[in-house]
């Protein structure tokens, strides 16, 4: 459960993480230095992840949008190994942002853990995937299913 101020996961660092709560949809936004992640208030679901890949204004694309199976440990402060590879791809493609969506929003380091969940998709996930799909059609985004 999210309570109070979240602290950075970086060792020895006690930097507060900015958080906003969307009471309409019961979502929590974690953000830091241009990076952002949206979670369920219970922290069991991560709905999307955005990391700034490039500074300046010379981009081939505004964003690379990745649609993957399920989120693991990545957040606005740190990337897990899979998202690190996506981030590196985004930089090579000269896109400004990496966005990560997941078919299942339930956070698990082992996808088999989702089988025991009543709702591995998450209550807000389908709506957000539709929103990002529409955005990809309207912009010069690269849409990657991995």
Identify what each model region corresponds to.
Residues 73, 85, 92, 111, ...:
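Catalytic phosphate/metal-binding cores of nucleic-acid and nucleotide-processing enzymes, i.e., regions
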Residues 48-58, 78-98, 134:
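Short amphipathic alpha-helices and their capping/turn segments at secondary-structure boundaries
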Residues 2-80:
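Active-site and ligand/interface coordination hotspots across diverse enzymes
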Residues 2, 20, 108, 113-146:
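Glycine/proline-rich loop-helix segments at beta-alpha junctions forming the active-site rim
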Residues 96-113:
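Short connector loops at secondary-structure junctions
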Residues 63, 96-97, 142:
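Residues at the starts of beta-strands that form the adenosine-phosphate
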Residues 41, 78-82, 121-128:
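Soluble or luminal CAZymes and related metallo-dependent hydrolases
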């Amino acid at each position: 459960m999210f309570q109070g101020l979240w602290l950075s996961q970086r060792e020895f660092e006690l930097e507060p993480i900015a958080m906003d709560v969307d009471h309409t949809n019961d979502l929590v936004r974690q953000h830091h230095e241009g990076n952002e992640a949206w979670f369920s208030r219970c922290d069991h679901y991560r709905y999307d992840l955005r990391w700034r890949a490039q500074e300046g204004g010379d981009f081939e694309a505004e964003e690379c949008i990745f649609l993957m199976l399920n989120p693991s440990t990545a957040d606005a402060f740190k990337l897990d190994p899979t998202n690190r590879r996506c981030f590196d791809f985004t930089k090579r493609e000269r896109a400004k942002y990496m966005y990560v969506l997941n078919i299942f929003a339930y956070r698990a380091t082992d996808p088999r853990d989702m089988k025991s969940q009543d709702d591995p998709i998450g209550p807000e996930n389908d709506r957000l995937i539709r929103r990002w799909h529409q955005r990809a059609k309207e912009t010069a985004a690269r849409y990657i299913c991995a």
